[in-house]
Structures are given as structure tokens and as C-alpha cells.
Amino acid sequence: MRTKQNYHLLTFHTTTAAMAMEDYCHEHGIPGRMIPLPQEISAGCGLAWRMRPEEYAQEKDRIEASKIQVENSMELML
């Protein structure tokens, strides 16, 4: 069994917003990946952008500059 790690998740109201964030992050070299929303969370479209908390801290301003609507932003052990 693998050890759980702390991650920062961004959730979205729509699949369109989730895919836009994935494209934006890839185009701008922002680390992370799209994952199915963990069962512990109930939110919008069922997808979340996952990244390490320290990466989110470094990239927060660029993510916010994307103007992509994020439903929730949280840290979670996965």
C-alpha cells in the first residue's frame, strides 16, 4: 500500500473549465495533472487538478491569471 501524500486540488463546476485548466497548465508549464475527484469530496464535474502544495504556492498567481472559474481550492491527503 502506498503512503498518502498531501496534495493541493482545484475542483471545477464544469468539465469545460477542468479541460481549460489542464490546457492552460500544460501550455504554461504549470506542474500537475487531472484526476477523478476523490470520493471524500463531492463537487461539480467530477474532475480535479492535482499538484503538490509547494507547487501551488509558486504558481497560484499564474493560475488565478487564467481567469478559469475554480469551484474549490483545497489541500487533501491522497
Can you say where each PLM-predicted feature lies in the sequence?
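Solvent-exposed alpha-helices and their adjacent loops that cap or buttress functional pockets
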Residues: M1-K4
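Amphipathic, hydrophobic secondary-structure cores in small proteins
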Residues: L9-Q58
